[in-house]
Structures are given as structure tokens and as C-alpha cells.
Amino acid sequence: MFALTAYRLRCAAWLLATGIFLLLAGCSEAKAPTALERVQKEGVLRVITRNSPATYFQDRNGETGFEYELAKRFAERLGVELKIETADNLDDLYAQLSREGGPALAAAGLTPGREDDASVRYSHTYLDVTPQIIYRNGQQRPTRPEDLVGKRIMVLKGSSHAEQLAELKKQYPELKYEESDAVEVVDLLRMVDVGDIDLTLVDSNELAMNQVYFPNVRVAFDFGEARGLAWALPGGDDSLMNEVNAFLDQAKKEGLLQRLKDRYYGHVDVLGYVGAYTFAQHLQQRLPRYESHFKQSGKQLDTDWRLLAAIGYQESLWQPGATSKTGVRGLMMLTNRTAQAMGVSNRLDPKQSIQGGSKYFVQIRSELPESIKEPDRSWFALAAYNIGGAHLEDARKMAEKEGLNPNKWLDVKKMLPRLAQKQWYAKTRYGYARGGETVHFVQNVRRYYDILTWVTQPQMEGSQIAESGLHLPGVNKTRPEEDSGDEKL
């Protein structure tokens, strides 16, 4: 009897101990932080990306790029600091994302793939792109998938494009292509541009951002249907993924994605082959003569000199002797009245013209309503520089009446062309204006500004531009050639 009781007591003690252990283990497991909680606790959102014009890069003003801007907004939503890390290639990106203690997510212009890799998951998509076969102008244009057979083709290793070609190879076993982890999209386009390879496969957004640097590249055909870009997250709980998806859905609904798309892609198609080729030449042959003047004005006025240089190029192609039938003259194409107001005694003197035009632009920008914030403020200032503040105000009022935001360039630029249509300008205070030309003016300046920002990164100074991966066709001289600089516009 006593032995039985003792046995029961021992069993009860064992069960109690086991229960306590399991309870503690359960509590410990329940208290393990989720992916979202870890980010919030650390106060840092670690994001891995690629270094390219379409994703992320650094200029003198700091970090920038479509993916950077979007990730920054997400970090702000979480109330944490954003920390950007860059990968050498896509395999490296996915490897770092999957390792324990790695980045919280990858924002790198990725199209969902790697279905066999359970360690990677993808968010909702946020930007539609189309994969495109790229060839060199002057070569025979492929028009269908079977035309790829026998061509020298290179794509990024580990990319969705490599997966697409692998699928095509099942249908055409003789198809050959190379995957490389030592190049980026910029390098692939350069190789096509100079003839080192025959073809490559890139997404439409990457081509849009880079084509101006490589005027010889052309789209052969779309290789498949449009697909959405997404962020990639490591496997684990859904807490951070749910927050990412909620953010992206809200960004789409509230217009953030459209504004970022307009900022980075809304002006990329303004240069054709001739324009891109000419700009590449002038970048090497003309800008060096006046760069110091732009930099001096930029420093004095606390304004990015490259934006001032972009205005100068749009106005005169950096020609100090430029004139027009309307009487504007000089590198910044100043009217006599504006020149006098800005203290310019000789409009044909490039230094005076740059100083006067720069001062005028900054003055216009400072006079805009405080409700207009950057970067829109600079785009509005460009519009006013071209069309005048009165007509710009007409367009803003028109936007407001249409239920649009009068402080957003994306909305107001839709109204400017109406200023040339009687049914609309008859209702405005200041009447007719060539608003469509102003939209093109702003788009052109923004595109030139983008190019200058990219090619004047710290690692691409001076003669390094000509030797960099950003190929400037036909331009390999570090010293400017002489030209008359007296073309009439």
C-alpha cells in the first residue's frame, strides 16, 4: 500500500515537472519575437539591393533610386532607420537574404521566381515590367524566339531572364547563352552597344533608365507577358510580409507608387537616338568648359549644379553664342529684361549667363507657394522658368478645379497643355500659353539632370566617365574639341 502510494507520488511529481517544463517551453516559444518585432526592436530595417540607376545609387546628395525611395517610405512607416546593403550579384543577394541574421528584405527590381527555393518569398507586386530582347542597331533584328539560336547571348546569373532562356532551351536545344555574375544590366547593355555580345534580355524599366547611355541598343521584341516587380523576404513568420503587403497596397492606392514612377520613369523617353548620341558628345566636348561656372553658381545659390547645367543644355546645348528669333541669347537664353534684372551686362559671356540664369531659376523657386515641396518644387520652378509664373498658376487653379493636387507636378502637368486650347484658356486669368512645350521642357531638363547625376557619381569623375561602364558612343576623348558654339536656335 505504501509502495503503491509512493509510486503514485513519484508519477505525479514527474508529470508535474514535465508539465512545468512544457509550459515554460511553450511560454519561451510564444515570446520569441516575430520578424516585424525584431526590426522594430533593433530600430533598423536592413534592405539589400543592387547598384543601378533603376534601383539604388549614391550621388553627392546621398542615396537615391526608385527602390531606395520606396524602402525609405516603408522604414518611415515602421518608425525605424533604413540601412541599405548592396549585393555583388543576384546569387549573392539571395544568399545574404536567406542566411540567419541577414537583411530583412530585398528591394532590387526583382521579378518573382525561384519557385523551388522555399527560403524566399515574394510580396505583392508594385510595378509592371516587360522582359525584352535587346539587339544592336544596324544588326539583323530578331523577331521571334527561334531567331535567338546561334546568337551570342548573355544575361544575369540567377535572374528570371536566365530561367526564361532555360525554358526556351527545352524547345530549342541548340540555343546557347551565358549567365554571368560579374556584370550588371548596365554592363549587358554596354556589351550589346559595342558589339561584344549580340543579344541580352532585360526588363523594360531597366532599359528605360539606361538606354540614353547606349543609343545603339534597340528592342527586338517583348519576350513574354508583362510581370510585376516585388520585394523578396526570407522564409519565416508572416508578420513582416503582411506589413510589407499592406504598405505596398496602400502606396498603390494613395498614389505614392505613381508619384515615384513619374519621378524616376516619367521623363525617360524624351531622348531618341540622335538626342542621346548628341548629348553624349556634348557631355565630353562642351560641358568641361563651363562646368566650373555651374559649380560656382550652384555653391553660391545652394543648388545642385547639375540641375543648373541641365537647364543650360536644354536652353542652348551649352553654346554661349546661341540666339533665337525671339531675342533671347546666350548659354542660358536670357531675355534682355531678365538679364538686366539679374545683373548680367553681357548675355554672350558664358559665366555671366550661367550666373544670371541660375540666379533667376533659384529666385523663381523661392517665390513658389510654401505648400509645394521638393522634388515637385524644382519641377514647378522649371515650368515657371519656361512659361512664366502667371500661366503656371492658371494651370494649378485648373488642376484644383478638376479635383487634382495643385502642389503635385504629376497632376499639374496634365493641365498645362490645356492652356493652348481655347475652350480652356478662355476661362483662365492669363489666357493662352504653349503649355505642352513647357511639359516637354521640364521632361527634357529632368532627363538631362538624371544623366548628369548618374555619370558624375564620385567614382566617375573626369576622364573616368569615358572609361566607365557607361559607354558614350563615339566619345572617348577627355579633352573637349573646339566647336563654334554659335548655333541659332
Curated annotation (Swiss-Prot):
<feature type="signal peptide">
    <location>
        <begin position="1"/>
        <end position="32"/>
    </location>
</feature>
<dbReference type="InterPro" id="IPR000189">
    <property type="entry name" value="Transglyc_AS"/>
</dbReference>
<keyword id="KW-0456">Lyase</keyword>
<feature type="active site">
    <location>
        <position position="315"/>
    </location>
</feature>
<dbReference type="GO" id="GO:0009279">
    <property type="term" value="C:cell outer membrane"/>
</dbReference>
<protein>
    <recommendedName>
        <fullName>Membrane-bound lytic murein transglycosylase F</fullName>
        <ecNumber>4.2.2.n1</ecNumber>
    </recommendedName>
</protein>
<keyword id="KW-0472">Membrane</keyword>
<feature type="region of interest" description="Disordered">
    <location>
        <begin position="466"/>
        <end position="489"/>
    </location>
</feature>
<dbReference type="InterPro" id="IPR023703">
    <property type="entry name" value="MltF"/>
</dbReference>
<comment type="similarity">
    <text>In the N-terminal section; belongs to the bacterial solute-binding protein 3 family.</text>
</comment>
<dbReference type="InterPro" id="IPR001638">
    <property type="entry name" value="Solute-binding_3/MltF_N"/>
</dbReference>
<keyword id="KW-0732">Signal</keyword>
<keyword id="KW-0998">Cell outer membrane</keyword>
<dbReference type="InterPro" id="IPR023346">
    <property type="entry name" value="Lysozyme-like_dom_sf"/>
</dbReference>
<dbReference type="Pfam" id="PF01464">
    <property type="entry name" value="SLT"/>
</dbReference>
<dbReference type="InterPro" id="IPR008258">
    <property type="entry name" value="Transglycosylase_SLT_dom_1"/>
</dbReference>
<feature type="region of interest" description="Non-LT domain">
    <location>
        <begin position="33"/>
        <end position="268"/>
    </location>
</feature>
<keyword id="KW-0961">Cell wall biogenesis/degradation</keyword>
<dbReference type="GO" id="GO:0071555">
    <property type="term" value="P:cell wall organization"/>
</dbReference>
<comment type="similarity">
    <text>In the C-terminal section; belongs to the transglycosylase Slt family.</text>
</comment>
<dbReference type="GO" id="GO:0016998">
    <property type="term" value="P:cell wall macromolecule catabolic process"/>
</dbReference>
<feature type="compositionally biased region" description="Basic and acidic residues">
    <location>
        <begin position="478"/>
        <end position="489"/>
    </location>
</feature>
<feature type="region of interest" description="LT domain">
    <location>
        <begin position="269"/>
        <end position="489"/>
    </location>
</feature>
<dbReference type="Pfam" id="PF00497">
    <property type="entry name" value="SBP_bac_3"/>
</dbReference>
<dbReference type="GO" id="GO:0008933">
    <property type="term" value="F:peptidoglycan lytic transglycosylase activity"/>
</dbReference>
<comment type="function">
    <text>Murein-degrading enzyme that degrades murein glycan strands and insoluble, high-molecular weight murein sacculi, with the concomitant formation of a 1,6-anhydromuramoyl product. Lytic transglycosylases (LTs) play an integral role in the metabolism of the peptidoglycan (PG) sacculus. Their lytic action creates space within the PG sacculus to allow for its expansion as well as for the insertion of various structures such as secretion systems and flagella.</text>
</comment>
<dbReference type="GO" id="GO:0009253">
    <property type="term" value="P:peptidoglycan catabolic process"/>
</dbReference>
